[in-house]
C-alpha cells in the first residue's frame, strides 16, 4: 500500500531466492501469507490498456475476504521506465457490489491476477514473495518510509542493491507489472540488473 498516496517499488525475478528467504526469516518481521485476487478494469471512455506504457490501472483486490479498490497513475522516464505511481486505495465491504458498480459505469474487466503473497517488513521496506498463476515467482520490494525529498530512481536502485547484497544474484525486472505480463506477454520487456 502506498505511503502518502505515492508508491515506489520494484518487482523482480531473482536468480537465487534462498538467500532472501533465509535473510527474511532471521531479520524481518513476517506479516502474512495471503491469497490475492486482483481484477483489473478499464473504462469504456478511456481504454487504459491501449496506451504504452500503460499508465493507469483500476483494480479490485480480494485478499482472503478483505477487499480494496485501487487506482494507480504511473510516472515514467523518457525511456519508458516507471519511477513511481500515484496510488489511491480504500477498503470495501463487498467486492461483488463494487464489481457491479464498475460494470454499470461501463468499466470492463481486462485481466485477473491470481497470486499467493508472503509479506515481511524489514526497516522501511515491505518485501513480498509472490507466486502468480501463469508467471514466474517474483519478489516485490516497496519503500514505506518518509517520502520527503525521496528520489524514486535512487530508492529503486537502493532496493536492487539490497537484494544483491544479501546474495540474490542477477535481478530481472519487468516494466509493466503482473497485469501487463498476463495481458501482453509478447510485449513484455525485462531489464537485467
Which ranges hold each PLM region?
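Residues forming anionic-ligand binding surfaces in small-molecule and nucleic-acid pockets
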Residues: 72-75, 134-142
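Short, intrinsically disordered/low-complexity patches at protein termini
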Residues: 93-94, 135, 163
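An amphipathic alpha-helical core segment
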Residues: 126-134, 143-146
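Mixed-charge, glycine-accented linear interaction segment located at domain edges/termini
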Residues: 148-177
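Active-site ExK catalytic segment of metal-dependent nucleases
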Residues: 9-11, 140-144
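Short, flexible turn/loop "capping" segments at secondary-structure junctions
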Residues: 1-4, 133-137
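N-terminal strand-loop-strand beta-hairpin
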Residues: 1-124, 168-193
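General beta-strand recognition
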Residues: 68-70, 128, 140
Amino acid at each position: 500500500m502506498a505511503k502518502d498516496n505515492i508508491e515506489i517499488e520494484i518487482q523482480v525475478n531473482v536468480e537465487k531466492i534462498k538467500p532472501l528467504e533465509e535473510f527474511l526469516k532471521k531479520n524481518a518481521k513476517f506479516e502474512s501469507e495471503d491469497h490475492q485476487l486482483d481484477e483489473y478494469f478499464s473504462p469504456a471512455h478511456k481504454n487504459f490498456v491501449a496506451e504504452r506504457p500503460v499508465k493507469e490501472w483500476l483494480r479490485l483486490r480480494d485478499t482472503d475476504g478483505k477487499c480494496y479498490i485501487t487506482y494507480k497513475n504511473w510516472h515514467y522516464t523518457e525511456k519508458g521506465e516507471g519511477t513511481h505511481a500515484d496510488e489511491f486505495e480504500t477498503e470495501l465491504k463487498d467486492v461483488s457490489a463494487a464489481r457491479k458498480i464498475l460494470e454499470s459505469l461501463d468499466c470492463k474487466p481486462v485481466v485477473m491476477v491470481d497470486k499467493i503473497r508472503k509479506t515481511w517488513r524489514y526497516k522501511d521496506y515491505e518485501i513480498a514473495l509472490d507466486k502468480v498463476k501463469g508467471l514466474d515467482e517474483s519478489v516485490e520490494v516497496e519503500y514505506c518510509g518518509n517520502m520527503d525529498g525521496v528520489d524514486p530512481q535512487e530508492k529503486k536502485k537502493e532496493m536492487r542493491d539490497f537484494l544483491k547484497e544479501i546474495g540474490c544474484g542477477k535481478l530481472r525486472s519487468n516494466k509493466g507489472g503482473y497485469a501487463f505480463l498476463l495481458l501482453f506477454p509478447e510485449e513484455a520487456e525485462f531489464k537485467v540488473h
